[in-house]
Amino acid sequence: IDAAIESKFVGYHDLTHDSKVTVLTTADALVDELKEGMEGTILVEETPFYATMGGQVADTGVIRTANAEFVVEDTIKLQGTKIGHVGKMTKGSIKVGETVTLAVDEARRNLIANNHSATHLMQKALRMVLGNHVEQAGSLVDPDKLRFDFTHFSPMTPEEIAKVEEIVNQEIQNGLDVVTNEMTIDEAKKTGAMALFGEKYGDTVRVVQMGDFSSELCGGTHVKNTSNISAFKIVSESGVAAGVRRIEALTGAGLIAHFNQVEETLKEAAALLKVSPADVVKRITALQEEVKTL
């Protein structure tokens, strides 16, 4: 691919955008046209699609013209400044030089944004509860959940987990506006914005601020207001390496689905024990006592 070809990301504000096709490829060759049924990668001048980066998964969606449709299954960074839309032509054909409409799956993007913004709130809450030694050691943000690895020397207690949840949910309820600003790395450091330990940053960085509560250097996509996240719950906390802990957590729609699943399991257990859900623990305790006397 020509080194002079670049792709500009315009997806912080626009989820639908018209742009010109600059490159088409199949798995093994550059082509002038992708036809129906073909799998390949499309590059354009400007795209609203976010490529996998900084722990945040890629956008999916469609690229279309009046007569053609390409389903985007993945978005990847190529040769630094190029963004490739990987997928399959499901209708018609698209040629190099054609103007296409790129449309990100908005519902999915919003779920990812909920989880990414919740990660920022949680990192601040972890530092408040556990101490300033907490540093991000890894992160995954997808539509279903968030996973966060951080430096800490021991398992979190139930009380510490509950306190982190309480702080995050309070800031969600507080409805903090999420504001992003671009500035030099020196300016960002002066504002006290949190940076990733060991990360190499360019001259200009993006600072994501959530009210007066959280400020971090981040290139990801976020909610406009913390109230969009709805609710937050930590579902697991475990060790992944010496001095590194991992949290998995859910927000919004993912959390409701989790609660529904847990409730269904509880109802099934209650039915098997022939008691109400509220009496499940009491019945299991009684059965354990019976077993001891056998």
Where in the sequence are the language-model features?
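A glycine- and charged-residue-rich anion-binding loop/surface
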Residues: I1-L294
